Design a protein with these regions (language model features):
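Amphipathic beta-strand/beta-sheet edge segments enriched in Tyr/Trp
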Residues: 27-36, 191-239, 336-342
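N-terminal signal peptide c-region/cleavage motif recognized by signal peptidases
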Residues: 19-21
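C-terminal soluble interaction/assembly domains
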Residues: 224, 260-342
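N-terminal segment of the mature soluble domain
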Residues: 47-73, 121, 125-182, 196, ...
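A short, hydrophobic beta-strand-centered structural micro-motif
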Residues: 78-85, 126, 165-213, 318, ...
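Acidic, glycine-rich low-complexity/disordered segments
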Residues: 133-135, 238-261, 267-268
Length: 342
């Protein structure tokens, strides 16, 4: 493919995901993996696992077959790494690895492995817990019960591994009281819609129905015992969530069989820095095969691009970028007008 010529631990990632939905659904750290170094694990093993996670992210599938397809084609994992560093955070060692986007895309193309762009779904988790003893409550990003802390940590891990956004609401006491009040006329789902932007809401209610029994209803149906409730609930919850993520990502696959040319007009470029930033942004669009600059006039860049995938995939990548504002497309859907957001 021809283009323009030329950290964080899980808790920190959790803060980023929860505190800034203004970035839309563009997963701009897609090619950077942070991996916890387990006790007794050497650097090479950690790098290999980081590579595997990178392939899972980019393909949208957690099946190891894509990893082995790449390795069996004569590629070494280390060839895809541009740099890595090791950091100690609160007594825990992490390896931060950055991967070569261009080489990965070319390899996926050569081996016909499905690829997912940076446009990633946002999941809102609304989980109500009623243990029959205390007042019912909604698990939020700040709630601190044992189950809540386990959920927060594992949600962050899953979001990082799959390259998606998984959000718990930020409810204060008034929010919870409003939602749980029988006199509150707005359904909880409507209340969330008024406060958050997301692609899919997963609403679950967990109720203790007996001394040794819990009922899980809504987006997940299950009957669980009390003895190992936290473990069993987390198991069925994350199995369900992982399936939902796989289904959503599968719908975002960029097809190599569809190869299209489009004209781009990018306005509001007022400096050399703006121009360089635009180049980097276009360079980062997954599925872009070639870019030809035609002219620059009146603070507007005119170029031709070749893109693997349908127009809808390209428009999603543009529309969900923090620095690009999609203005319109022509009637024939061959001309795309964009504005650079300062």
């Amino acid at each position: 493919m021809n283009y323009f010529s030329n950290n964080i631990n899980y808790i920190f990632l959790l803060i980023i995901i929860f505190s800034n939905l203004s970035f839309g659904k563009e997963f701009d750290q897609l090619f950077k993996i942070n991996h916890k170094i387990e006790s007794g694990q050497n650097i090479d093993t950690s790098l290999n696992r980081s590579f595997d996670d990178m392939i899972y992210r980019l393909s949208g599938s957690t099946k190891p077959s894509n990893v082995w397809k790449i390795i069996n084609a004569g590629n070494a994992r280390k060839d895809f790494i541009t740099k890595y560093s090791i950091k100690n955070i609160s007594g825990t060692s992490y390896i931060f690895t950055e991967f070569n986007q261009t080489l990965l895309e070319q390899t996926f193309f050569d081996l016909n492995i499905p690829i997912i762009g940076k446009s990633r779904p946002v999941y809102m988790i609304m989980l109500e817990v009623d243990d029959g003893l205390n007042s019912p409550y909604f698990v939020s990003e700040t709630s601190s019960n044992n189950l809540d802390r386990l959920l927060q940590s594992q949600i962050s891990e899953l979001a990082s591994k799959r390259g998606v956004f998984i959000v718990l609401p930020s409810f204060d006491l008034k929010d919870s009281e409003n939602i749980l009040s029988y006199n509150y006329l707005v359904e909880p789902e409507k209340y969330l819609e008024s406060k958050y932007d997301y692609d899919q809401l997963i609403s679950i209610k967990v109720i203790k129905t007996g001394i040794n029994e819990w009922k899980v209803a809504g987006g997940l149906e299950a009957m669980l015992g009390s003895k190992n409730f936290n473990r069993d609930f987390l198991n069925v919850f994350f199995n369900m969530l992982d399936r939902e993520v796989s289904t959503s990502l599968n719908l975002k696959t960029i097809s190599y069989e569809s190869n299209n040319n489009f004209s781009l007009k990018i306005a509001n470029i007022n400096s050399v820095n703006d121009y360089e930033k635009i180049k980097d942004l276009l360079f980062g669009i997954i599925g872009l095969n070639n870019i030809k600059i035609n002219k620059f006039s009146n603070n507007t860049l005119f170029c031709e691009i070749n893109f693997y995938g349908k127009l809808g995939s390209l428009l999603q990548e543009i529309d969900e970028n923090s620095y690009l504002n999609l203005l319109n497309t022509s009637d024939l859907e061959e001309d795309i007008s964009i504005e650079y957001k300062l």
